[in-house]
């Protein structure tokens, strides 16, 4: 069973994603911001980090950089609504930092789960 760290500050979206991932037999650990995610990140267990990019305390860009220092091979999916700048700028930065996939909000849950499956099985 794959272990996923899900980082999203929107409680409703995080709950929906967690439920969908668990229905697909993934183990999900939740965090509401990058700082909390770093505390919960388990390098030996984590197969995938799914992170929003715009969050309080520590954003997803900083989180990706920190996690890639700890475990460069960890897979990452970045999601963003982009705030005032729109999602494309933030998502392209995430790709440059090593995100394996990016999704602009709102996105298709079916496409999202398919991408998770293709990345970690």
Functional labels for PLM-detected ranges:
Residues 11-29:
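Two-component/phosphorelay signaling modules centered on CheY-like receiver
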Residues 55:
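Receiver (REC) domain active-site loop signature in two-component systems and cognate sites
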Residues 8:
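Conserved acidic carboxylate
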């Amino acid at each position: 069973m794959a272990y996923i760290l899900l980082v999203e500050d929107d409680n409703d979206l995080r709950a929906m994603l967690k439920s969908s991932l668990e229905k697909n037999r993934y183990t999900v650990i939740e965090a509401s911001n990058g700082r909390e995610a770093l505390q919960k990140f388990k390098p030996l267990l984590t197969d995938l980090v799914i992170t929003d990019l715009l969050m309080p305390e520590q954003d997803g860009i900083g989180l990706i950089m920190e996690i890639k220092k700890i475990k460069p091979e960890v897979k990452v999916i970045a999601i963003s609504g982009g705030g005032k700048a729109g999602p494309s700028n933030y998502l392209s930065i995430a790709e440059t930092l090593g995100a394996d996939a990016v999704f602009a909000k709102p996105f298709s849950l079916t496409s999202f789960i398919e991408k998770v499956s293709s990345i970690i099985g």
